[in-house]
Amino acid sequence: MEAIPLVRSSLSGTLLVVVKLSALLIQNRAHLYNFLLLKIFLFNHWLLGLTQEAQGFHPPSKIAGCPVGRVLWAGLTLLEVPVCLALRVPRLVWAGLLGCARALGLGPKWLGAWEQLGLSAATWTDLFLSCLHSLMLAALLLLLLVWRLYQKAQCCSLGRLPRKALLQNRVVRRSLALLKSLYWWVESTAALTSWHLAYLITWTTCLASHLLQAAFEHTAQLAQAQEAEPQKALGLSSETPPPGPPAPGARPVLPEPGTPGE
């Protein structure tokens, strides 16, 4: 019977540690977003290189006046706009929803319900915003991957043979299918590796900060205990009064006769 409460206490302690680490991960999500922005920036740079290679098949004079090229360059230069929107729009929307809820008098009820679950409203807000950011960044990356695949197919279709001949050739179609499958495999492997690396760095940072916080709290408790010991000693010494001088009318007690004091 005693083993069941021990198991429950260990499970509750493990769940509490997991919740704390999740909260720390949410608080340190800026590092993950910076890593994703760096990845998107490198991805954009690679796309620029691919477009330059694709445009190298044609004379530069035609490329400069081509409307498709201008649209492509404009889209690449405006790539930072959806990234900024993906990072800022959810926070603005959430702030508007909270303002409307407070205006309608629903804010305190939501805050009380969230605090009953063991986490503050700020933590739940950060969790919601991080989920929205992750979804929007994933959608943006998916759009970029689709666009790059389309550009890759266009680059592969450009050559000496016409497009119809390429489509009718089975060898070319099989090679394109193999290249597509290889590309998707490399892309999925790279994405998983980068995500795992980002989560590993984030979790390591959270664990280090959690350990530092625990060490700081332990040091503060030890310092408080050491400061309390002299105060206790002073209190005990003040409670016991010092022996006063003898009264003036009192006489010293003489030893009785027959005692060893004679």
From Swiss-Prot:
InterPro entries named in the record: WBS28 (IPR029166)
Places the protein is found: Membrane
Record-level GO cellular component terms: membrane
Annotated organism of origin: Bos taurus (Bovine)
Entry membrane topology: Multi-pass membrane protein
Main subcellular localisation: membrane
Protein name: Transmembrane protein 270
Pro residues composition-biased segments: 240-262
Membrane-spanning ranges: 6-26, 30-50, 67-87, 92-112, 127-147
Disulfide bond sites: none
